[in-house]
């Protein structure tokens, strides 16, 4: 008889414990239900990279002096600088420059220590390819002008996940009806146009006032 009641007590204890853990899981679920959605519908939606994002490296052939500083400061000696010595001018002549982005860790040392600023970091991060050999960019591919996420009209950049208002550290703390942080390029252009038009109207008003003053003084 005592064994029967002991089994009932153990079963009740396990049931209470299971219910407790179930409620804890539901509490986490309900907490996430009240949060803002963070799913990015890539590639139709993209995050705006930060201002100092280290993306694809941009290279300017005309500025390079083949000093190979980028090779020495690279942790894996990645950049390949092909040059020959000109016996007449006794200077290096650059033939080719390449970086393999399949191996690059995007540390930015080459950009930081370049004496002529021929290297710069862009905000391009879509470098995936089917063939890893296609990730070996030569000076022509590196010299291609970088593309911006905000310049693609088919993409809606998610500003609230890229920049948060001052003092906000968690994007889930923002109310659902709050305005997004930052502005789209189109909104910035409209704002600049309105500002210029208002400025021109103010200038015209000042000119009219000054002309009236001159006429009054002449009379």
UniProtKB/Swiss-Prot annotation:
It is an enzyme of class 7 (translocase). One of its GO terms (molecular function) is iron ion binding. Binds 2 [4Fe-4S] clusters per subunit. GO terms for cellular component: plasma membrane-derived thylakoid membrane. Its main location: membrane. It comes from Prochlorococcus marinus (strain SARG / CCMP1375 / SS120). Its EC number is 7.1.1.-. This is NAD(P)H-quinone oxidoreductase subunit I. One of its GO terms (biological process) is photosynthesis, light reaction. It comes from the Bacteria. Belongs to the complex I 23 kDa subunit family. The lineage of its organism: Bacteria, Bacillati, Cyanobacteriota, Cyanophyceae, Synechococcales. It catalyses: a plastoquinone + NADH + (n+1) H(+)(in) = a plastoquinol + NAD(+) + n H(+)(out); a plastoquinone + NADPH + (n+1) H(+)(in) = a plastoquinol + NADP(+) + n H(+)(out). NDH-1 shuttles electrons from an unknown electron donor, via FMN and iron-sulfur (Fe-S) centers, to quinones in the respiratory and/or the photosynthetic chain. The immediate electron acceptor for the enzyme in this species is believed to be plastoquinone. Couples the redox reaction to proton translocation, and thus conserves the redox energy in a proton gradient. PROSITE patterns: 4FE4S_FER_1 (PS00198), 4FE4S_FER_2 (PS51379). [4Fe-4S] cluster 2 binds at residues 74, 104, 107, 110. It is a peripheral membrane protein. InterPro entries: 4Fe4S_Fe-S-bd, 4Fe4S_Fe_S_CS, NADH_quinone_OxRdtase_chainI, NDHI. [4Fe-4S] cluster 1 binds at residues 64, 67, 70, 114. NDH-1 is composed of at least 11 different subunits.
């Amino acid at each position: 008889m005592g064994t029967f009641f002991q089994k009932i007590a153990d079963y009740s204890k396990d049931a209470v414990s299971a219910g407790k853990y179930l409620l804890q899981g539901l509490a986490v679920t309900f907490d996430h239900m009240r949060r803002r959605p963070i799913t990015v519908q890539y590639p139709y939606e993209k995050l705006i990279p930060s201002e100092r994002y280290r993306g694809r490296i941009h290279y300017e052939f005309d500025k390079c002096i083949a000093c190979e500083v980028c090779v020495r400061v690279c942790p894996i000696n990645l950049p390949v600088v092909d040059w020959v010595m000109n016996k007449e001018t006794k200077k290096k002549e650059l033939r080719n420059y390449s970086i393999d982005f399949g191996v690059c860790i995007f540390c930015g040392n080459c950009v930081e220590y370049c004496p002529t600023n021929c290297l710069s970091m862009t905000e391009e991060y879509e470098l995936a390819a089917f063939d890893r050999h296609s990730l070996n960019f030569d000076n022509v591919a590196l010299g291609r002008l970088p593309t911006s996420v905000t310049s693609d009209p088919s993409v809606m950049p998610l500003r609230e996940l890229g920049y948060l208002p001052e003092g906000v550290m968690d994007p889930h703390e923002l109310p659902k009806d709050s305005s997004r942080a930052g502005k789209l390029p189109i909104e910035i252009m409209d704002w600049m146009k309105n500002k210029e038009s208002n400025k021109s109207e103010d200038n015209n008003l000042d000119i009219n006032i000054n002309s009236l003053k001159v006429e009054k003084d002449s009379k």
